[in-house]
């Protein structure tokens, strides 16, 4: 088999066999296939696409290029949730203890943030003493005992994906549905999930800006999962404004605690209940989505979800008293109110710009090596559709520097107030095939 033949075959719009895809991935990881040939095939895929069988084969080739986490010692159906990323996306922090409280095992591998805000790991590390570097045996033991544990990404998972992603990043082949879908799904499958719930974001703060693109990605990932024996479904949710009210690590953790107490923002609570209901059904803990939703609401109302979060924090070395004493979380030195320049209704909160403003304060990373400030960020006091009076606070800037003129300038272009009301949509579609 020759790489040049595989490139020409895909260039001319033909279907690659599983053997050809395996030959490419194996050779590329070993270093036998040079970058210039790999980038040539990536560009051919970008223009000619792949069918469902090719996408599944590419995904499994990347899974098999490295280690796979063995979660077989964990009792029950392990359901993983993946979000394509957004601004103020606190769902994992709420979902993990919430679905664990209704007996769904959550063995979660999460990453650090790059860009707008921190990842789940950064947010959890805002809790004093919390550690995510735990070995596989401890990880499995914690999930069996308490139904929930979160670890940082480690080991040699999907090395082919890491190598191919770095190549796509510099060769203009990032925005390819088969390449994005196989990249995401290879990581989820290698992490040992039996079933997968996907939260595909769309809008100004999302990777997929249009609903059409988000749908294409959701369908691609759901089909890959189902084709390789992982029960998979996707929800397309809106990221035209940040989710919830908090953007920043300790601020989002506080918001997660409030949500588990039943006092969280409406949009975050609704998205968590929608995703959580799907997870509960996939884990065979309820027969219908309505029944699953009722179980989750009961777990919040009874305090069971909050108790689960406390035990989860304690199990991983963290100070569980932060739940009742949020002032023990990192606090920013200054709180600066950003006020409305006129009266009307909020019609636009550009997620990307608000995320960048939060990053300028120190809440996110530009490179993997950057340190982040866990205390800083932005809290939205108004959301799209809300009425606001001139001089009223639109948002609060939590900063460790007094001069935030650069941040204010960024925010000026991200907020629009008009004399008409806009009603945002939170959940656009549910995709099951």
Curated annotation (Swiss-Prot):
Phosphate binds at residues 81-83, 92, 108-110, 120. Gene3D superfamilies: Nucleoside phosphorylase/phosphoribosyltransferase catalytic domain, Pyrimidine nucleoside phosphorylase-like, C-terminal domain, Transferase, Pyrimidine Nucleoside Phosphorylase, Chain C. Catalyzes phosphorolysis of the pyrimidine nucleosides uridine, thymidine and 2'-deoxyuridine with the formation of the corresponding pyrimidine base and ribose-1-phosphate. This is Pyrimidine-nucleoside phosphorylase. Belongs to the thymidine/pyrimidine-nucleoside phosphorylase family. The keyword Mitochondrion does not apply. Substrate binds at residues 168, 187. Homodimer. One of its GO terms (molecular function) is metal ion binding. Keywords: Glycosyltransferase, Metal-binding, Potassium, Transferase. Its cofactor is K(+). It is an enzyme of class 2 (transferase). Binds 1 K(+) ion per subunit. The keyword Aminoacyl-tRNA synthetase does not apply. K(+) binds at residues 88, 90, 243, 246, 255. NCBIfam families: PRK05820.1, PRK06078.1, Y_phosphoryl. GO terms for cellular component: cytosol. It holds the Pfam family Glycos_transf_3. It comes from Staphylococcus aureus (strain MRSA252). One of its GO terms (biological process) is pyrimidine nucleobase metabolic process.
